[in-house]
């Protein structure tokens, strides 16, 4: 997730949902046993209270994600191939990613400043890449790669996600954002599907009367549009529609694509 725009709210709101830890801090052993990640890495800055906080919040977020998807928690580690890092693999500097997934090493890194809020986004990238790798193609399944040997039902699901996100007005808004970049990013099947997945997760949690900003924190469309209007006034020119997530009218199509 590169820092092209403030697509996340500045602060995460308190989580709302079931108590997955019985009110107690989670230990590294319980975390490892619950999810089965290949490894969990912390950067040098992540010490003491911050390390425990990251463990607790990521534990709750992953449990919430498993509930949304209807899968066992250990399934989120993608057969134990996925690794998780907290502020351990970022490069820093201007416009550095706030969080990223590394397909070469199969690791999600959540950075110190703004990584929390991006977990659902980066997990989708990992799953998208996992299924493409698992069936010999490499790359990402939503990028249209050939998936030899994958069950027809699973192939159809990825095609539906790709088709649905490509058909949304979101794609036009993403293309407008990409005009500010030297190469496409927002308007790529990989990114469109990841942002649609975030909105899907938020909507499914809302159905349960729950919310988890550590898992997915997305700026409100109205706030984004106000900021964009101010940007256009400052730099000159017209304010384009650029909201990088599905709007309320687009959510039914997103739900259908991910629910099937």
Model region roles, listed by residue range:
Residues 2-56, 71-260:
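Active-site-flanking segments in enzyme catalytic domains
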């Amino acid at each position: 997730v590169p820092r092209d725009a403030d697509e996340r709210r500045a602060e995460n709101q308190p989580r709302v949902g079931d108590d997955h830890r019985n009110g107690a801090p989670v230990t590294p052993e319980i975390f490892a046993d619950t999810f089965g990640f290949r490894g969990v890495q912390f950067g040098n800055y992540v010490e003491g209270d911050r390390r425990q906080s990251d463990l607790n919040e990521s534990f709750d977020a992953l449990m919430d994600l498993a509930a949304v998807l209807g899968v066992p928690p250990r399934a989120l580690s993608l057969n134990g191939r996925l690794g998780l890092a907290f502020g351990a693999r970022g490069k820093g500097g201007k416009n550095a990613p706030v969080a990223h997934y590394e397909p070469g090493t199969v690791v999600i890194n959540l950075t110190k400043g703004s990584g929390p809020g991006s977990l659902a986004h980066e997990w989708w990238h990992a799953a998208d890449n996992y299924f493409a790798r698992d069936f010999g193609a490499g790359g990402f399944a939503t990028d249209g790669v050939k998936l030899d040997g994958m069950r027809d039902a699973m192939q159809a699901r990825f095609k539906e996600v790709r088709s649905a996100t490509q058909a949304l007005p979101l794609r036009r808004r993403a293309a407008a954002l990409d005009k500010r970049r030297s190469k496409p990013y927002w308007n790529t099947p990989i990114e469109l599907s990841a942002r649609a997945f975030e909105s899907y997760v938020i909507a499914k949690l809302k159905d349960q009367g729950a919310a988890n900003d550590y898992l997915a924190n997305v700026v409100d469309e109205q706030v984004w549009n106000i900021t964009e209007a101010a940007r256009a006034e400052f730099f000159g020119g017209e304010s384009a529609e650029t909201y990088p997530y599905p709007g309320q009218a687009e959510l039914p199509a997103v739900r259908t694509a991910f629910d099937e």
